[in-house]
Regions:
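Glycine-rich phosphate/pyrophosphate-binding beta-alpha loops
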Residues: 232, 240-242, 285-299
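ATP-binding N-terminal substructure of ATP-dependent carboxylate-amine bond-forming enzymes
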Residues: 1-108, 143
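Flexible, glycine/charged-enriched surface loops at secondary-structure junctions
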Residues: 265-270, 316-322
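Conserved metal-phosphate-binding beta-hairpin within the catalytic cores
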Residues: 260-293
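Active-site nucleotide/adenylate-binding loops and adjacent lid/helix of ATP-dependent enzymes
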Residues: 115-197, 206, 218-219, 249
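Residue-level detector of conserved catalytic or cofactor/ligand-binding positions
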Residues: 333-343
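Phosphate-binding site of ATP-dependent enzymes
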Residues: 179-235, 246-256, 273-280
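Internal hydrophobic alpha-helix adjacent to the cofactor/substrate pocket in enzyme cavities
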Residues: 303-315
Length: 343
């Protein structure tokens, strides 16, 4: 069986992937932390073979490091590669030909990675589909700021365009209740020559935020897991502190149709907001979500299923992997954070 390599930005999903697969197969598992704030990770015996922590300011530096690392390891078969951060997806995409020679990939093709890891590009792409989406504008100039003030319904959400801008701005999502709040935030960000995205806020609490995580095979077969982000921390900021599985056939059909249309093959996740019975596309990840563990809890273990597929194992997914509803996931690392939340 093939070994597993995870290029990680955070611990939770990366360790979950290794644990899920290592519990079934006596293989070697490797975690490469990329530009992570994790200084040292002591893993339970037998679950993770090796961990390294790299700082790489560019894709070229990353490629030099992993090329050297790969040459020092002997793999009997091509290892299966998982990326658990936007940055690792983008870095791998830049050297995809080399990675396809050295690994079995679980990420989608480069066009999907490049579009959906940039919220400005993804907004343009979504408008060409049948998906509903909140009114959105990429803010590049003072005129764009004024356009939002005149044409958008408040409150609005501002968010960075990609992972690089998120580091500069310092937040994933910020809700602006008033025009004055929006103006203050927007002019402050734009003064630093940082472009960002503005969206109309879709009404509804955390329990109206839905997740749809999936693995789509090359033949079009999809195994999925869906449910509600019943608690976000901080509130309304997108980070799921607690979730519950809950199948919704309408949402499943919407998601599956969309993934088929764009030709998605690999692991990923989509966030939706429910309002008045409709589902609005918020964003998509081209990698396992940080809460991928919930798929194990729901008995649809997506990383393991991707591993089965990489090893060409025959699966009857309709019988083997049926989501169990009302299964709860709790991210204790978020629950224990103390930070003021939006009322």
């Amino acid at each position: 069986m093939k070994d597993v390599v995870v290029i990680a930005g955070a611990l939770g999903s990366s360790f979950s992937i290794c644990k899920s697969i290592r519990s079934k197969y006596l293989i070697k598992t490797y975690i490469i932390f990329l530009n992570s704030d994790i200084e040292h990770f002591s893993c339970p015996t037998g679950l993770v073979t090796e961990t390294v922590n790299w700082v790489a300011d560019s894709a070229n530096i990353f490629f030099e490091r992993i090329n050297e690392w790969y040459s020092l390891h002997t793999f009997k078969e091509l290892p299966v590669l998982y990326c658990t951060s936007d940055e690792s997806c983008m870095f791998v995409a830049q050297f995809r030909e080399w990675f396809e020679l050295k690994f079995i990939l679980t990420i989608p093709d480069n066009s999907i990675i490049n579009i959906y890891n940039n919220k400005g590009k993804s907004d343009v792409s979504i408008k060409r589909t049948d998906l509903l989406a909140p009114k959105t504008l990429t803010i590049k100039t003072h005129d764009d700021i004024e356009t939002v003030k005149k044409a958008f319904r408040f409150p609005v959400i501002i968010k960075p365009i990609d992972y690089q801008n998120q580091r500069k701005i310092g937040f994933k999502v910020k809700v602006c209740d008033s025009i004055d709040d929006y103006s203050l935030q927007s002019f402050g960000i734009l003064s630093r020559r940082i472009h960002f995205l503005c969206q109309e806020y879709i009404p509804g609490g955390d329990d109206k935020s839905w997740f749809y995580i999936f693995f789509r095979m090359a033949n079009g077969t999809i195994v999925d897991c869906m449910g509600k982000k019943i608690v976000q921390h901080p509130r309304g900021k997108g980070n799921m502190a607690m979730g519950i599985t809950c199948r919704n056939e309408k949402l499943a059909k919407i998601s599956q149709s969309f993934l088929k249309k764009i030709g998605y093959v690999g692991i990923g996740g989509i966030e939706f907001k429910e309002y008045m019975g409709d589902f609005y596309f918020i964003e998509m990840s081209t990698r396992p979500e940080g809460f991928i563990q919930i798929s194990n809890v729901a008995e649809t273990p997506l990383p393991l299923i991707a591993y089965y597929d990489a090893n060409l194992e025959v699966m009857d997914v309709g019988r083997q992997f049926i989501q169990k509803d009302d299964r709860v996931y709790v991210d204790l690392s978020l629950i224990h954070i103390s930070e003021p939340t939006r009322p």
